[in-house]
Each structure stands twice: as structure tokens, then as C-alpha cells.
């Protein structure tokens, strides 16, 4: 008689992200993970380079898949036990332009003043590579955020806190930037950097225990 026993679940996954927010969000839904970060000889930033004329949704999907493939190669080279690998990437877009991580304080201030008093989109793509090395179809979370028309001085003070650096669009919704946000339509966790609804669905497909 055929066995009805389901394949065993993986007790952990590999998270290929340095983002503390993504780590916190995985812990929020009970996922155990081990970090799988780029080696010193890897140029992780090069994967985030834009292609001419590339739309924001195509960009964030492409970057996420590229990061996932790099992480899978890193795992194989490390000799660590096989387990699913999770990668995500977030970008902000307004007027068809992609706003990545600010290069410096002036860049951060320019981004924030561009967002002021207007609505923009936050796109986060999530990719999971199964323990067998197969890439699951990536998920895309799309949210709208409206910033208040705050005074320029308020944005200057925000930049001086250092919080905008390393954040797409130069702000963190879970931090002090919350004072500028009039409303959102979409996924709060997606805006933070890891949409939990879509992520949970991918992890179930990859048979990750949580």
C-alpha cells in the first residue's frame, strides 16, 4: 500500500539578506533561518545596477532572481546542508523613476523632497530557491504610499538621523519616517522589505517549517 507520509519539512531556511527588518519579519511568523551573506570577494551591489529603460517591476524581479541565483551558488560552494534559500529586494518608484538607496545626504534629501506631498509605489519581490535548487515563481508585492507635504527642514532633520541610508527611497516606514506618511494601500510588511503573506505562501511550497 502506498505510503501517505508527506516529505519532511525543512527546520530552517537560508536568508540571503543583511536587512535587520527582513530578519525581524521572518521571526515574527516563526521562521528559523541562517544567514547566507555575500563573501568579501562578491560584488553584491553590481546586481542592483539598472538597465536602460527598465520598468520598476521588471527591475525588482530581475535583481531578486539574480540575488537568489548568487545565493544558491554561494550555498553550494560552502558545502552547507541543502535547504531552501530566501531572497528579497525592494524598490521605490515615482514618475517612472526607480529610487534606490541614497548615495549620500544630498541624494537622500532629493528623494524625500520628490516624494513630499505625493503618492509613490513600493515594490518588493521575493524569491525562494528550493532545497533541490529549483527557483519557485517569484512573488511581487505592490503598495502605494502617500507622503505628507512636510517642510523641507523636517526632511533635513530626518536625513541627519542617518535612518535614510541603506533604504530604498531614503526612508524606513517602521522608523521615524512614519511621521511623514499620510496613508498606505497595500502590504505594510512589503513596504518594510518582506511581504509576509506572499513570503509565507512561498515557504509552504518550499516545505519550510514554521
From Swiss-Prot:
Q: Where in the cell is it found?
A: Cytoplasm
Q: Name the needed cofactors.
A: a divalent metal cation
* The keyword Manganese appears for this protein: no
The GO biological-process annotations, alphabetized, read as:
nucleotide metabolic process
The protein here is known as dTTP/UTP pyrophosphatase
Q: Which GO terms describe its molecular function?
A: dTTP diphosphatase activity; UTP diphosphatase activity
Which reactions appear under catalytic activity for this entry? dTTP + H2O = dTMP + diphosphate + H(+); UTP + H2O = UMP + diphosphate + H(+)
Q: Which PANTHER family match?
A: BIFUNCTIONAL DTTP/UTP PYROPHOSPHATASE/METHYLTRANSFERASE PROTEIN-RELATED, BIFUNCTIONAL DTTP_UTP PYROPHOSPHATASE_METHYLTRANSFERASE PROTEIN-RELATED
Predominant localisation class: cytoplasm
Q: State the organism named in the record.
A: Burkholderia orbicola (strain AU 1054)
**Which CDD domains does the entry mention?**
Maf
Q: Which residues form the active site?
A: 89
- Which Pfam families would you find in this protein's record? Maf (PF02545)
The annotated site for Important for substrate specificity falls at 21, 90, 174
Q: What is its EC number?
A: 3.6.1.9
Question: HAMAP family annotated for this entry?
Answer: Maf
Q: What class of enzyme is it?
A: hydrolase
Annotated InterPro entries: ITPase-like_fam (IPR029001), Maf-like (IPR003697)
In the UniProt record, which is one GO cellular component term?
Answer: cytoplasm
Question: Belongs to which family?
Answer: Belongs to the Maf family. YhdE subfamily.
UniProt keywords (A-Z) are: Cytoplasm, Hydrolase, Nucleotide metabolism
Amino acid at each position: 500500500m502506498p505510503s501517505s507520509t508527506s516529505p519532511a519539512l525543512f527546520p530552517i531556511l537560508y536568508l540571503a539578506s543583511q536587512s535587520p527588518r527582513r530578519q525581524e519579519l521572518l521571526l515574527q511568523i516563526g521562521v528559523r533561518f541562517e544567514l547566507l551573506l555575500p563573501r568579501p570577494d562578491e560584488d553584491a551591489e553590481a546586481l542592483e545596477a539598472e538597465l536602460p529603460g527598465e520598468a520598476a517591476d521588471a527591475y525588482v524581479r530581475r535583481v531578486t532572481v539574480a540575488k537568489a541565483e548568487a545565493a544558491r551558488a554561494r550555498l553550494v560552494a560552502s558545502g552547507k546542508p541543502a535547504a531552501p534559500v530566501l531572497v528579497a529586494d525592494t524598490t521605490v518608484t515615482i514618475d517612472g523613476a526607480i529610487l534606490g538607496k541614497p548615495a549620500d545626504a544630498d541624494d537622500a534629501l532629493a528623494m524625500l523632497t520628490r516624494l513630499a506631498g505625493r503618492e509613490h509605489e513600493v515594490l518588493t519581490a521575493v524569491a525562494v530557491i528550493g532545497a533541490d535548487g529549483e527557483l519557485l515563481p517569484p512573488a511581487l508585492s505592490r503598495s502605494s504610499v502617500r507622503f505628507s507635504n512636510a517642510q523641507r527642514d523636517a526632511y533635513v532633520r530626518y536625513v541627519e538621523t542617518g535612518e535614510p541610508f541603506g533604504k530604498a527611497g531614503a526612508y524606513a516606514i517602521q522608523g521615524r519616517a512614519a511621521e511623514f506618511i499620510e496613508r498606505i494601500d497595500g502590504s505594510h510588511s512589503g513596504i518594510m522589505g518582506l511581504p509576509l503573506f506572499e513570503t509565507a505562501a512561498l515557504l509552504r511550497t518550499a516545505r519550510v517549517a514554521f
